[in-house]
Amino acid sequence: MYPVDLHMHTVASTHAYSTLSDYIAEAKRKGIKLFAITDHGPDMEDAPHHWHFINMRIWPRLVDGVGILRGIEANIKNINGEIDCSGKMFDSLDLIIAGFHELVFAPHDKETNTQAMIATIASGKVHIISHPGNPKYPVEVKAVAQAAAKHHVALEINNSSFLHSRKGSEDNCRAVAAAVRDAGGWVALGSDSHTAFTLGDFTECRKILDAVDFPEDRILNVSPQRLLSFLESRGMAPVPEFAEL
């Protein structure tokens, strides 16, 4: 459906089941041109050590025509928008996703959740907010979408939220998509794969986007070039190997 997937986990997050090589093979099979590995930040109980993220610099950029982005799904830690990504980790990473996870930041009231999410957006350290429609973390959706548009941060529609986790996300995600549409911001689609078999599956995301008539020209996954232009506008140095994507 789209040639870019921006959210997935490998065996480095020990509740996931596929390797980098598994994802490359599945990307080739499905025609995915560019994907980001985004294992959980180190404050999660079963997450990789911070050296895992620093050492991503040894990865090839391109394997058999498939581009690989070095990423993290960091954890929002507090109302000040601090995340568990710092120092040399930033030097090795292309894509910083951040979101709420109960083991790191327990659910709070809507005002507190909103304060934490907007502070994270405004920090300048994050490219995408993961699963902002999670019903366990109610937020002021309009305010979050406006902040995201202002700071050039995408809000994610997460396919896994409608299948395996975060039950009851549908209404919230429709509200998120509509608010991003009205604010003129960006949406990022993530399979949130924990196994390579679901790489590039945005079937449920598409239903959400269609329900609110979301414009294609505000979806980062439409092409590698669009996603890379977005990242470069946020300060990522151009990657010569990606020119052929």
UniProtKB/Swiss-Prot annotation:
- What is the E.C. number? 3.1.3.-
| Co-factor binding comment | Binds 3 Zn(2+) ions per subunit.
Positions bound to Zn(2+) 3: E73, H101, H131
Q: Extract the InterPro entries matched here.
A: Phosphatase_YcdX_put (IPR023710), PHP_dom (IPR004013), PHP_phosphatase (IPR050243), Pol/His_phosphatase_N (IPR003141), Pol/histidinol_Pase-like (IPR016195)
The answer to whether the entry has keyword Lyase is: no
Q: Locate the coiled-coil region(s) and give their ranges.
A: none
Q: Name one GO cellular component term.
A: cytosol
HAMAP family per UniProt = YcdX_phosphat (MF_01561)
The answer to whether keyword Ubl conjugation applies is no
Q: Which family does it belong to?
A: Belongs to the PHP family.
Name the GO terms of the biological process aspect. Answer: bacterial-type flagellum-dependent swarming motility
Q: Which gene encodes it?
A: ycdX
Q: Which residues bind Zn(2+) 2?
A: H15, H40, H194
Cofactor(s) needed, names only, are:
Zn(2+)
**What name appears for this protein in its UniProt entry?**
Probable phosphatase YcdX
Quaternary structure annotation from Swiss-Prot or TrEMBL = Homotrimer.
Q: For this protein, what is any one GO molecular function term?
A: zinc ion binding
In which domain of life is the source organism classified?
A: Bacteria
